[in-house]
UniProtKB/Swiss-Prot annotation:
InterPro entries: M28_fam, M28_SGAP-like, PA_dom_sf, PA_domain, Peptidase_M28. Residues 152-255 form the PA domain. GO terms for biological process: protein secretion by the type II secretion system; protein transport by the Sec complex; proteolysis. This is Aminopeptidase. Mature protein inhibited by dithiothreitol and Zn(2+) chelators such as 1,10-phenanthroline, EDTA and EGTA. Not inhibited by serine-protease inhibitors, N-ethylmaleimide or phosphoramidon (which inhibits elastase).
Amino acid sequence: MSNKNNLRYALGALALSVSAASLAAPSEAQQFTEFWTPGKPNPSICKSPLLVSTPLGLPRCLQASNVVKRLQKLEDIASLNDGNRAAATPGYQASVDYVKQTLQKAGYKVSVQPFPFTAYYPKGPGSLSATVPQPVTYEWEKDFTYLSQTEAGDVTAKVVPVDLSLGAGNTSTSGCEAEDFANFPAGSIALIQRGTCNFEQKAENAAAAGAAGVIIFNQGNTDDRKGLENVTVGESYEGGIPVIFATYDNGVAWSQTPDLQLHLVVDVVRKKTETYNVVAETRRGNPNNVVMVGAHLDSVFEGPGINDNGSGSAAQLEMAVLLAKALPVNKVRFAWWGAEEAGLVGSTHYVQNLAPEEKKKIKAYLNFDMIGSPNFGNFIYDGDGSDFGLQGPPGSAAIERLFEAYFRLRGQQSEGTEIDFRSDYAEFFNSGIAFGGLFTGAEGLKTEEQAQKYGGTAGKAYDECYHSKCDGIANINQDALEIHSDAMAFVTSWLSLSTKVVDDEIAAAGQKAQSRSLQMQKSASQIERWGHDFIK
């Protein structure tokens, strides 16, 4: 079979497979390996308006080696700015400038969207000790930690338990109602149990009752709710007092210690400021049928953020540059989100401030957050809910199938990843916009089965440098970066040519729109995580 016929066969087989409920790998997948081999782009096609005339052109032109050059630029920016690119820092501003200038040079009109947010950075570890009835010192990151977005403070006070419900299987509502603080002695430290409502509500109720500080301990209703976790009082917290998180066992012990007095110190910086999203779109394409692609540009304060999420940002930037002269049928809009690490602030602001008619124009949103993890897996957001139960908005299952089809065409295995609201698709989900995307893993541990699928080491984190100083260029797996950059390019190209697979799924769901809307509202009300941290 000729290469030309190979290509024609691939496109035909792929179109059929994507529309099917169950996808099978093309029978001649091995023959396509040569076509997909990295390092063989056709320069005349890569610089041509015909780049997206088929979904196969853009992935062929998007080379990981060029993405790595952009990652090196982001690492250089971090190196010149205290080792990070966190939102509202000079390193982030330099990252914004780099993306903006690169897009402008490619011919894009670029919008830099400011938005308010509360910057939060730990300056050092906290301290916690008992002074009465006897001295005890507790260990940082073993017995207690900060809730993200806590205020700073240095408090010594009596500890007062608030409406606790101890024991396995408990349904704690501790601190969720103002009435829980009846007769609460002002100036005390409120000891509150996790459960039911969000941490912000608990802390603000305590502050309103006159608490000088708050300790929220884990719920203890199940074995996985006893230790420390990444938790937050939220970017909108206005209680004005320090809040720390502790283990369930410590919380129980403190609640049963008469006349307990604790000294807690929280050493953080928290201030209201503003930062930016960067948005650009192709000059051509139907403006009423937009395919939106997004990746967060900011890092955490602790490191340069080259995998998280320089990888998604740099791959998206390289793709945008390649698409600058292309002729898509549908307009492609790119966004580099700010303050994702502070709680998806930039993407949430963007979606919530779109007029209803503008939201309707976004047919699909594609999210790329961490696509170069060193011990990677090929993870696709579970749009159809077949792996984790929660479905995306109508059209999301079709997007998942497109990604699955790509991996099968490449002879690669893949699997679903949970819709857990840890990245910037969250507000698109809440707005009922079809979404999909890729992820190669963060702090979770690779299983034996996954090691057999993808290689790497079982029992080891997908990214041991997640949210750490060592998240630099050396932390990038270039094989993962190549595969996932190509997958991003493939699905973006496909949808830029036609959103029929998404349209058909939305139309099919139309008769069930009311029940689907109620399901979406219920799902949104049950969200326990928003970004990196648990919110309740």
